[in-house]
Amino acid sequence: EAIAAVSAAIRRNRVGISPKHKPVSFIFVGPTGVGKTELVKQLADDLFNAPESLIRLDMSEFMEKHSVSRIVGSPPGYVGYDEAGQLTEKIRRKPYSVVLFDEIEKAHPDVLNVLLQILDDGQITDAHGRKVNFENTVIVMTSNAGSDNKASGAVGFGGSADDQGKERIMKALQDFLRPEFLNRVDEIVCFNHLTKENFCGIARIML
């Protein structure tokens, strides 16, 4: 289901149905160990035929207000002004990339504001005044939001456990992401818990 949703969104962008000058964007939500990061790695390999086209930013390193300067570069007069931003410089040199923002719920709100501008305009200005175009990138954010609570079974008219899980995940995302942010994301992909059949299939592939 997750792979089908990602594939459909990529195809919509390729045929021109999605808005122009806007990168394809996803939020992968689910418990740890269900393959969110592995799918991102495979996506980078399949889209651009190069695993090194994946740019990964761990949001646990961007929890402070000043950490936003590490993305676009430090402003004039501050330490590190001569150094380019970790993200903007990589995209400027390699515009066809998959950008992974891992554990987005840990990011400082100012970092989310920068990301919102990228999702909205498809470009951002770095500390040196240069426009960096994200039109040809794929933006993926991962989160464990809503997955720490045990999914309760369907009772009465409550619907299926999967539907209840998706509702719980959406409520958890809304706790730290504003509506205008969520509305600019192409697809929110919910990863289900792995079943016994899934584990058997993974074991066969690895063996």
Regions found by a protein language model. Give the residues of each.
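AAA+ P-loop NTPase nucleotide-binding core of proteostasis motors
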Residues: 1-207
